[in-house]
């Protein structure tokens, strides 16, 4: 009878222990802890790669911005550079055209020369003043030494001057009804005429009193 009448509390105690034991496998705390994923080394590498990729994109964007600015600056400078290039090209073409015209005119003129005129022209082309004599003359006048370029320039100018005087003297000789060779009187008259035309500067120094 005593066994049959066990108190409910004793049964309840055994039941409670069994419930607690059964509840251990399904403990929510243990389940939640196991369910949280832990960070691994692979995830850290992925984050570093993403950060590096973002930095690369920013750098490439900065480079593209700088390139755009440089292109804009060059586009602003291009019109002036193009204009200068076009002007230089036009001047070169114009000069080349003028040279071709001069050569053509000279060929026509030479083809119309008489034999005597052609001989005089050839002699004039081949003639030249001795550069050493020109250099000594310049140094005696200026009292200083001069470069070779100055000597060449003065030699060419002197040749042109003598050619103009001789040509004018031949015109004087023809006008006076005389025949060559040229005489001193022809040369003096040629120089006088060229001075009157203003083609020869006056060598006499004039003191200017009033300004």
Curated annotation (Swiss-Prot):
GO terms for cellular component: Golgi apparatus; nucleoplasm; nucleus; transcription factor TFIID complex. Component of the TFIID basal transcription factor complex, composed of TATA-box-binding protein TBP, and a number of TBP-associated factors (TAFs), including TAF1, TAF2, TAF3, TAF4, TAF5, TAF6, TAF7, TAF8, TAF9, TAF10, TAF11, TAF12 and TAF13. Interacts with TAF13 both in vitro and intracellularly; also interacts directly with TBP. Keywords: Acetylation, Nucleus, Transcription, Transcription regulation. It comes from the Eukaryota. Transmembrane segments: none annotated. One of its GO terms (biological process) is mRNA transcription by RNA polymerase II. InterPro entries: Histone-fold, TAF11-like, TAFII28_dom. This is Transcription initiation factor TFIID subunit 11. The keyword Secreted does not apply. It comes from Homo sapiens (Human). The keyword Acetylation applies. TBP and TAFII18 bind to distinct domains of TAFII28. Residues 1-81 are annotated as: Disordered. Residues 1-14 have a biased composition (Basic and acidic residues).
